[in-house]
Structures are given as C-alpha cells and as structure tokens.
C-alpha cells in the first residue's frame, strides 16, 4: 500500500553501503522511520529528500506485517538552505531535532509539534535569533514532557507575591515567604520568568523581533536546562556540540571587546 506523508527529517543513519534509515516527523502520523534504499548514491532521487532537516512530501510503501516502510519517492518543499549554511543555525537545528526525537514516540500523531518544528526551522532559515528560538522550543517541549514549570503563582503556596525565585525541586516560582523551603532555588529577574511564561503560550508563527539582554538569556538557559537535567536526564550529542560552539562564540566576543 502506498501512503503519502508530509514530513521533516530529524535523523538520518547510514544503512549498508548505499541506503539510509530516515526518521521523519510527519504532520499525519508523528515520528516515523523509513528505509531509503540507495539514498547514499550521488544520483539517487532520494538523496536530497533523505537529508537531515529536509521538508518534503514522501510517498512510501507500507502495510501490515511489512516492517519498516520503504521510501519510494519524495517531493521537496524546503531544504532550509540558508539555515544549513550557518554553522550556528545548523547546530541549534540539530539540537532541536534531537530533542524532539528523544521526547516523542513513534506513530503518535501530533500536528501541533509538526507545526512547531516547521515554524522553528523557517525562522532559523530567515536568520532569526537562534538562541531565543531554541529557548522557546525547549519551553514548549517541557510542556510535552509533562514537566512545565508553574509560572503563574508560587508553586508552593499558590499566592502571587513577588519577587520570585524559581525552584526546580518544587516545580516553578517561589514567593519570598516560601523561598526558605528550597535552598537551591534560583534567583531570577522578573524579565526571565515573565518571558518563560510568555514562551509557554506564545504562537511561534507570530514571532517578531525580540530583544533579550545577555543576563536574561543566561538565566533562561540555566532555568530550562536545569529542569531538563533534573527530570529528563537526556544525554544529547547535539547539546554537547552546541555548548562547545557557544563557548567559542563567547571567547571570540570577549577578544573583540
């Protein structure tokens, strides 16, 4: 049986001398793995559509009892060429793709996540702020994972009393009265927790230019990574590379200053 899916490649692994196992996130069926036979050959009609980040329509042979579907052909919609040509944007895209891959199961339809990934890649391709796009994506993936921070009131007492700190252990904001309950709570500026709260409900399709101070960027990253490290315990290869790249960029900026 031939089936047609709209998907974005989030992982591609060599298989044998000439083929690839391609993992795509589809609009219709969520995450799927397909066999792209001969895709490693230079002249293969599957070479382009099986590349990482490719957004295409895919025609596959699938059916009950047939195992992994075979990719028959693809119709490229967007290769995100400009994103690929930027080392920074590519590094963030790889991290975003791996994070999505690790936090989703196969064949669980989620059109919202497909749209989130698509709009994130489109914004990266347009040269938007890759770091902020990544923070927005991380915030929304915490919701998917069921560990989204409580950011509307104190997670301990439910009262709305500022200034807030953020407690990973208690799952969100802590008011001044409850702050002693967690000696490891993180002091954050109002801008940080308000941006995180905005990111939780923000429609990425409407993204404009967002100006975020370096100190706030650092706090956003620290809070989100702390929640992921505490509750998800992910070991992402792309995150290690991204952090190396960020360190190099900070060193370059420091030398220029």
UniProtKB/Swiss-Prot annotation:
GO biological process assignments: DNA recombination; double-strand break repair
Q: Which HAMAP family did the record assign?
A: RecO
Which cellular component appears as one GO term in the record? bacterial nucleoid
Q: Which UniProt keywords apply?
A: DNA damage, DNA recombination, DNA repair
Q: Which NCBIfam families match?
A: reco
The text of the family note is:
Belongs to the RecO family.
The UniProt entry, under SUPFAM superfamilies, shows: ArfGap/RecO-like zinc finger, Nucleic acid-binding proteins
Q: Does the keyword Phosphoprotein apply?
A: no
Domain of life from the UniProt record? Bacteria
Q: Name one Pfam family in it.
A: RecO_C
Q: What is this protein called?
A: DNA repair protein RecO
UniProt organism field: Brevibacillus brevis (strain 47 / JCM 6285 / NBRC 100599)
Function according to Swiss-Prot or TrEMBL:
Involved in DNA repair and RecF pathway recombination.
Known Gene3D superfamilies for this protein? Nucleic acid-binding proteins, Recombination protein O, C-terminal domain
